[in-house]
């Protein structure tokens, strides 16, 4: 780009943050997927949850609204990053304690709409980013959608994507949050699917609920 010019003809080119998108941009983009005639999608991923709690809830709610409008797709939601991790200015990350994380996750999902078109997961995985040669924490919504896609392809859509045979999470070194039985009970009773690590089984999806807030024939992903 040396010697180049911007659209105004000036040479004061800047690139920092040029590809960054705000929550308004994401929500605006998601609106396009309400058009079922032009866009064919099965899974709507929340993607990055780097924003604060309220902003992340807004993006999650939009994903759900789009899936509800389409009625032929499912939204996959992860909590906001700060529910699990404390980032400091020197580039290191501290993982919050298990009780704080549990309360944060429950608080994040509590106001989200009850829906059969959404799937809520419990967190973040630690993985190797081969493009930047570093390890980083990423939200699990893409992985949960992946277990559903894999199950659709290798078995049938009405099979559960959870468990040790079909719910394996790939490319994961560890979890930011590995809920025990007490935490899993609290999460699952609040329509949140735990992702856990267990010796011998690795990291797996341990639940197959939809985001429906009441018992129903439609409160499971595989129905």
Where are these regions (language model features)?
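A glycine- and small-residue-enriched flexible loop/hinge signal that marks low-structured segments
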Residues: 1-223
């Amino acid at each position: 780009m040396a010697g180049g010019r911007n659209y105004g003809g000036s040479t004061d080119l800047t690139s920092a943050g040029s590809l960054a998108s705000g929550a308004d941009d994401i929500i605006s983009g998601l609106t396009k997927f309400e058009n079922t005639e032009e866009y064919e999608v099965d899974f709507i991923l929340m993607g990055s949850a780097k924003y604060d709690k309220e902003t992340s809830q807004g993006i999650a709610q939009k994903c759900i609204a789009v899936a509800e409008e389409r009625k032929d797709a499912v939204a996959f939601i992860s909590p906001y990053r700060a529910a699990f991790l404390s980032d400091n200015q020197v580039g290191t990350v501290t993982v919050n304690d298990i009780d704080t994380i549990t309360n944060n996750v429950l608080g994040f999902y509590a106001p989200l709409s009850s829906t059969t078109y959404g799937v809520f997961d419990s967190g973040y995985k630690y993985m190797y980013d081969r493009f930047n040669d570093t390890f980083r924490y990423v939200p699990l919504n893409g992985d949960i959608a992946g277990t559903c896609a894999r199950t659709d392809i290798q078995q049938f859509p009405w099979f559960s994507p959870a468990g040790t045979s079909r719910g394996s999470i790939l490319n994961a070194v560890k979890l930011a949050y590995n809920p025990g039985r007490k935490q899993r009970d609290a999460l699952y009773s609040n329509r949140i699917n735990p992702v856990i690590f267990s010796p011998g089984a690795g990291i797996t999806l341990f639940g197959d609920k939809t985001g429906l807030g009441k018992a129903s024939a439609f409160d499971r992903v595989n129905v």
